[in-house]
C-alpha cells in the first residue's frame, strides 16, 4: 500500500489484496474541508461538493437504511464522519428506486454502514456514493459495483468509525 493510499483511506484498507487495489481506483478522493465541527441542528452549511464528503454537520447522524424522503446534507455528513457510506440517488423511474433498494439489501455491510437517500442535486438517473473524503458516481444501478464499494470503503474512512 502506498503512502497516498494510506492518507486517502485513513489507514490500510480492509479485505483481500485485490480489494485494497480496487479501493484506490474507486471514484476520486475529495479534500477534507478544514472545519468538521458540529453546528446547531437546522443550520445550513455551504459545502463545496454535491453531495458533500466532509465538513461541518449536525450532531445527530441518520440511522442506517434506505430512505425515500430527503435527508439533509448536514445530517448525512455526520454519517460520513463515522465511516458510513451514503448512497445518494436521483431517479424519476420507480423501477430504478426498487432496483437500487434490492441491490443494497443484498449487501450485508449496508445494514451497519449504509444510508441511501434521494438527492436532486445530481443528474437524473445518477447515483453518487460518498465516503469521508471520497466520491464515486455512476449512471443507473450496478449491483456488483455497489458491493465492491461497500467492501472497499465501509468503516474505512472517517475520523470516527461507528456503525449506524
Which stretches of residues belong to each language-model region?
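Mid-length scaffold segments of soluble, non-membrane domains
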Residues: 65-109
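Helix-rich interaction surfaces within compact, conserved domain-sized segments
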Residues: 103-164
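Solvent-exposed coil/turn segments that connect beta secondary-structure elements
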Residues: 50-52, 90-92, 121, 132-135
Amino acid at each position: 500500500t502506498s503512502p497516498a493510499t494510506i492518507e486517502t483511506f485513513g489507514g490500510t484498507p480492509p479485505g483481500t489484496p485485490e480489494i485494497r487495489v480496487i479501493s484506490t481506483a474507486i471514484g476520486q478522493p475529495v479534500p477534507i474541508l478544514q472545519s468538521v465541527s458540529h453546528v446547531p441542528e437546522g443550520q445550513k452549511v455551504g459545502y463545496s461538493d454535491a453531495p458533500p464528503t466532509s465538513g461541518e454537520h449536525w450532531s445527530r447522524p441518520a440511522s442506517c437504511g434506505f430512505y425515500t424522503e430527503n435527508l439533509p446534507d448536514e445530517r448525512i455528513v455526520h454519517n460520513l464522519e463515522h465511516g458510513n457510506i451514503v448512497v445518494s440517488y436521483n431517479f424519476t423511474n420507480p423501477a430504478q428506486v426498487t432496483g437500487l433498494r434490492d441491490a443494497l439489501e443484498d449487501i450485508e455491510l449496508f445494514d451497519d454502514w449504509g444510508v441511501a437517500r434521494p438527492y436532486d442535486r445530481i443528474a437524473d438517473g445518477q447515483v453518487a456514493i460518498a465516503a469521508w473524503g471520497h466520491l464515486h458516481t455512476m449512471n443507473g444501478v450496478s449491483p456488483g459495483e455497489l458491493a465492491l464499494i461497500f467492501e472497499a470503503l465501509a468503516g474505512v474512512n472517517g475520523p470516527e468509525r461507528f456503525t449506524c
